[in-house]
Amino acid sequence: MMSQPAKVLLLYAHPESQDSVANRVLLKPATQLSNVTVHDLYAHYPDFFIDIPREQALLREHEVIVFQHPLYTYSCPALLKEWLDRVLSRGFASGPGGNQLAGKYWRSVITTGEPESAYRYDALNRYPMSDVLRPFELAAGMCRMHWLSPIIIYWARRQSAQELASHARAYGDWLANPLSPGGC
């Protein structure tokens, strides 16, 4: 008997999604997978008024939570930051009684406007990507979630169509069975 793939909630946050070729290409395979729920935060909450109980219910229903977004000022777009602050509340995701996400999996999928070489101590951004993403790793730990190695698409705008298609295939393969041995 084959086990079902883990249910994945893909939280997509891009304020200018229509202009992001890379993110649109990455999302395409996700929309074709029955175990993946793609949840576009900017489409659902253009006014930033987040339905916290609805979002928390979505989190409870999924085992793997993917945060897909561009890197904005060494962080995430504003709506995702608001979502993190409001939805991952004390008593739900952390603190006394806050164990609703314990044991689930967190993976960040990030697009950047600069090459990987820009993320070094001696380079333009002065820090490696692992340091830049540390707040997200800490948030996962606060929620008692397993932190999965991030997927980073560097210099997303400058990737060829073939390179983006290759990234999308690999991403889609992972989403189809995210907790398979070697899949994390």
From Swiss-Prot:
One GO term (biological process): positive regulation of potassium ion transmembrane transport
Query: Which Enzyme Commission numbers does its entry carry?
Result: 1.6.5.2
Identify this protein by name.
Glutathione-regulated potassium-efflux system ancillary protein KefG
Membrane-crossing residue ranges in chain numbering:
none
Q: Which residues form a coiled coil?
A: none
UniProt xrefs under InterPro entries: Flavodoxin_fold, Flavoprotein-like_sf, K_H_efflux_KefG, KefG/KefF
Tell me, in a sentence or two, what this protein's role is.
Answer: Regulatory subunit of a potassium efflux system that confers protection against electrophiles. Required for full activity of KefB.
By its UniProt entry, which SUPFAM superfamilies does this protein fall under?
Answer: Flavoproteins
